[in-house]
Amino acid sequence: GSGKTKVLTTRIANIIYQKKAYPNQILAVTFTNKAAKEMQLRVSKLLGSDAVGLSWLGTFHSLCAKLLRKHATAVNLNSNFTIIDVDDQIRLVKNICKSENIDIKQLAPRYILAIIDKWKNKGFYPSEVIINQKDIYEKTILPIYKIYQQKLIDLNSCDFGDLILHVVKILEKNKDLREIYSKNFKYILVDEYQDTNFIQSRWLKL
């Protein structure tokens, strides 16, 4: 809540004020845009022009989008990729189901997307998914996930889940890049750390 955000803001201000780090050496992550905006405003109030350069303050998704634009080619995207919303995701899944003769009355697109999202949050690309044998639908959904990911790449697009997933995969594969970022960020501060899911905490640990 905002009490936590306040504590975090004060910490950021102190780090910069005491010259323990430059603003761009602080990675500050929030869950909501509202909290990110609030933090930015508070730090600016406390520090004035010294707060300039706090360029790594934002939500998981906004920070990962920023990182991904820098390294998009590593996952076969261009840096001007688009981020698709839920309506576009549903449309895409409906089209795939149609071409694969899957009855969306039996298997709702929203449910398909929920499973895909679950896999992404666990850090799995389609080739890495291990199907839960007890789930009769996962067998059907995995091939859809494969096509869905390929279509996103073809469209030079990402969904929200991809933003973090792609960045984690890029950093896992590239030791040099990982070292550049871990050397750059002297402080990593997270609002509500206990709420992070697997892929989010994996990203923070990299």
PLM region spans:
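Charged catalytic and DNA/RNA-contacting regions of genome-maintenance
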Residues: 191
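Walker A/P-loop
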Residues: 1-11
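A basic/glycine-biased coupling hinge at the interface between accessory DNA-binding modules
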Residues: 13-187, 198
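Short, conserved "post-DEAD/DEAH" coupling segment immediately C-terminal to helicase motif II
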Residues: 198-206
